[in-house]
Amino acid sequence: RSSDLKKTSVFIHGFNFEYAKNADWKWISANLNKALCIFVLSQDFKNELIRRGIKSDIHLTSTKVPDYFISGFDLSMRQGKAENIMYSGRIEKAKGVYETVDTFSILKSQYKDLTLTFVGDGSELPMLKQYVENKKIKDVRFTGELRGEDFKKEYINADMYLFLSYTEGMPTVVLEAMIFGLPIFTRKVGGLIDFFENGKMGYISSSLDPAVFAEAMKPYIENPAKMRSVSIYNSEYAKTHFVASVVVRKFENTLKKYIEL
């Protein structure tokens, strides 16, 4: 009986466009169209589902940062210093880690006090360390995987965030970096495209060219007032859009509309 059927919503957390090319969309559509609604992390994902014949309502949502993660962080500490560039996440080629090193190498030749910190572990870590050693690049630090307060300290000690991943859904690490007031330098991938404001939040581009990102970062390194302005904007924006309590409340309000039908 239809009254016995459970109302179901679907949250699609990742999306592989290459896989989608050869997927069984007849089967996928038949099942997804049974859902009351679907949540995805970017407008591109939503557009692809619609193009493939999904008729259920599709809503954009976000990954989230736990409210407690930023407890004790004082935004006033961001005074425009630009010395430590940070990357966090899996150490894999597809995360743009080599491009990150090359971007830093370009900048390091001009700004001698710059440092680069990699937070994370992955299959590419030994090769990346060897790459840095072979190129004789100084002041690159690898922390390995960190959690909790140790991870939080790295965000606090960083000044800029460089994330050149090839593909993404909605990278939580970028949202975390924003909450901690870091200017973001990243690529047009996944859900970042839907909200990122070039100039106000840092820099976003489709490019994978390290020279492009090095050039984009120079005005920030040389202008403490610009760094400070972006730090404040990013932290406030992220607190009002990406902390768990905000994301969950919006999620619940959307679902309530369907429950009340």
Task: Describe these PLM feature segments.
Residues 183-186:
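Short hydrophobic beta-strand element within catalytic cores of glycosyltransferases
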Residues 212, 219, 226-241, 247, ...:
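A short, well-ordered alpha-helix in the C-terminal region of glycosyltransferases
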